[in-house]
Amino acid sequence: MHYRTGYHADQLGTPPSVLETGPWRLHYQAWSRNAHDTRPPVLMLGGAFQSFRSFAAEVEELLEHHPVILLDLPGQGGNLQLAPELGLGALADLIADFAEALALPPLMPIGLSYGSALAALFASRHPQRCARLLLAGVTTFGRPGARALLEESLRLLEEERLAEFAQGSLTGLINPLRLERTGISPGFRKAMLRQLQRLTGAERERYRQNSRRLLDFAGFTHYPSCPTLVLAGEFDHFTQPWEHAAFAAACTQADCALIHDGDHLAQFERRDACAQLYRPFFLDQALPAAPIGATRLARSRLNEVERRQEPRLAPAQRAGRLHHAELGSLAVEVQELGFFGARLQGALPAGLPVRGWQLALEGLPMLDLLPLRQAGDALSLVFTHMDAAASTALAEHVRPAQLAAAA
């Protein structure tokens, strides 16, 4: 491997090197302080809406001690080649092909969000090629609510309802209830919303293919055996802390840490807290016992992490109505209400349609929702947050009661 030297953040926007393996083109940039570095490289694999430039600060930080490779597989990042026939496992195998073609030593992947599934599969399927593994925003998509929302996002794209798709996706990535803790600015949210609203036809197709891979993924048959570090944002409601902890518990040699005041974007919101953990991890040094801005979870307690991301409380006004274009209006009692979902009770017909539902509550706009589980006269649901005004109103409605309950 011949590494580029003289790194500067602006160079992440320059054309990548391209490796062809069979019909597939793999885009990469390889950086080091030494052009002929033989040390194990850190391999960066990003999420759905990230590019090489998203990792400018991390590359600068890591280059002090490691060579760094940024890799875009087909359909990822800036690689526009579509690969609908490749599942997650086949994409992960391309990482092994990449390492073999360039005669790389065992890699140290960093997998973020969508990239976490690829990195973890690479580590589990090719253990001899993986020295260490760092994951954040672990996407296994076994949780019914997450799957329902992802399916709905695909339907919205198919129907060209980009504004609603963008609003729902933004609410998944950024926790609106915790903005004062995560520090996400209105300007950042607006910029991300515009990016989502303006996806080109090719970008939408890539999103569709990547999302379908996640939904089609049957789960891990075996887990990484190399030293593994899993970082979870404490307010991540998209890929929740208990899911990170459960994944870490299934790995042979995993540590799991909760990043304070972070959500699904914790690795960008709380760079210092994350760095103080991954720096020693990649150097095979002991992790700090009491890291600043993070909490390490005891391995014996990984399967005991709280599964509910927010308190669901009984509203002061419990009477509500479910509306559906075909079934009309149905009276319900709201037993639990949160920002992300609710639990209702009422005389509901069996086999409810998947789409087209709204909940009417006194003092709130109509709330779009997806039914999740129906058991007798009880219904659990998730809110889709496709309407910004309704989402904001619901957040303002539930926040005081949730803060009081947590006090």
Protein language model annotation of sequence segments:
Residues W24-G78:
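Conserved HGGG/HGGXW glycine-rich cap/lid loop of the alpha/beta-hydrolase fold
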Residues L313, Q317-G351, G356-Q358, A375-S380:
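Short strand-loop-strand
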Residues I69-I110:
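Active-site loop/oxyanion-hole signature of alpha/beta-hydrolase fold enzymes
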Residues G262-A275:
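Catalytic histidine-centered segment of alpha/beta-hydrolase-like enzymes
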Residues P224, V230-A232:
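Short beta-strand/loop motif that positions the catalytic acidic residue
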Residues S124, A131-E160:
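Flexible "cap/lid" loop of the alpha/beta hydrolase fold
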